[in-house]
Design a protein with these regions (language model features):
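Glycine-rich phosphate-binding loop of ATP-grasp-fold ATP-dependent ligases
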Residues: 40-41, 65, 69-96, 127-130
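Conserved ATP-binding module of the ATP-grasp superfamily
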Residues: 55-56, 60-64, 88, 92-121, ...
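General beta-strand structural signal in soluble alpha/beta enzymes
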Residues: 38-42, 64-67, 116-120, 204
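Short, surface-exposed amphipathic charged segments that create phosphate/polyanion-binding patches used
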Residues: 52-59, 77-82, 131-134
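Short, flexible beta-strand-to-coil junctions
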Residues: 69-70, 122-123, 149-150
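Conserved divalent-metal-coordinating catalytic cores
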Residues: 1-35, 43-47, 75-77, 95-101, ...
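N-terminal auxiliary "cap/dimerization" subdomain that precedes the catalytic jelly-roll/cupin core
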Residues: 36-59
Length: 280
């Protein structure tokens, strides 16, 4: 499957790529270096408190206040879900916004930063999905797409809903079969982000709007069990070698009936299963 062109990918500084301590910076990086659509967002600092009404004029009718803790992710661990995100909130309800803002900050640790993310709430969402580059918590090299079909944008991450559809695809596949075309948009965005960040262990949250257009809510490093890439490649090599050997042996011979060779590790133990001119 083709990856869309990423305008400034060749000029990216590795130090500017995947940020473990600031989800807002990751979104900003994607916005500036790709064509992936993102609901309008802004990183809010404590100094913005006094002119919050002016800032909110830039947003749609409702917003989500998302955590942006510097302790949420490190290069070894993740605290995904530990810190609050609150919404949707009417952007004109200033008192509730300030109250919710403080509640999100209070969920942080004492020596944490004091920023949050204000993001447009996607009203009338068709679905929300979490895409992971690998099966979480395992060595399994499977892309995982977990989707909830409904407007609850926290359905997958909150753990409060059980009607979630999971789709797995092995990382060795570069294209999706036609029958799985509903997942094309997820596959495409995941590839774009992995290439953009130069990182193939990502945790991505996507929502589809009322037009079924995918919108990126957040992207973060995928934490969990370290992927043992060498054993995976050894396993793949063994499979490839066996396939090659089978193709060499599949050619029919004059002393056997039929047009296809079928191999078994039991037929030599049961004469009744040995079919041919000379069962010896």
């Amino acid at each position: 499957m083709e990856n869309d062109d990423i305008s400034s990918k060749n000029n990216l500084n590795p130090q500017d790529q995947l940020n473990y301590k600031n989800k807002a910076k990751n979104l900003e990086f994607v916005k500036n270096n790709s064509n992936i659509k993102i609901p309008y967002f802004k990183e809010i600092i404590s100094d913005d408190f006094e002119n919050i009404e002016e800032i909110l004029e830039e947003f749609s009718k409702q917003i989500i206040i998302r955590s942006n803790s510097s302790k949420e992710d490190t290069d070894e661990t993740s605290s995904a879900g530990k810190f609050l995100s609150i919404g949707p909130i009417d952007k004109n309800d200033i008192s509730l916004i300030k109250k919710s803002w403080n509640e999100v900050l209070q969920s942080y640790e004492k020596d944490d930063n004091n920023t949050v993310i204000f993001q447009d709430y996607v009203d009338g969402a068709k679905s929300v999905s979490v895409l992971t580059s690998y099966k979480v918590g395992t060595d399994s090299p499977y892309r995982t797409f977990s989707t909830y079909y409904g407007s609850q944008t926290d359905a997958v991450t909150s753990g409060r809903y059980n009607k979630i559809k999971n789709f797995f695809i092995h990382r060795s596949l570069d294209n999706l079969p036609e029958k799985f075309k509903e997942y094309y948009k997820f596959f495409k965005i995941q590839n774009q982000l992995e290439n953009l960040f130069g990182n193939k262990q990502l945790d991505i949250e996507i929502v589809t709007d009322h037009k079924e257009e995918p919108l990126l809510l957040q992207v973060r490093p995928l934490m969990g069990k370290v992927i043992k890439k060498e054993p995976i490649m050894v396993e793949r090599s063994a499979i490839d070698e066996n396939v090659k050997r089978y193709k060499e042996l599949i050619t029919t011979t004059d002393d056997r009936f039929g047009t296809n060779q079928i191999y078994s590790n039991m037929s030599d133990m049961n004469p009744a299963e040995m079919i041919g001119k000379k069962p010896d």
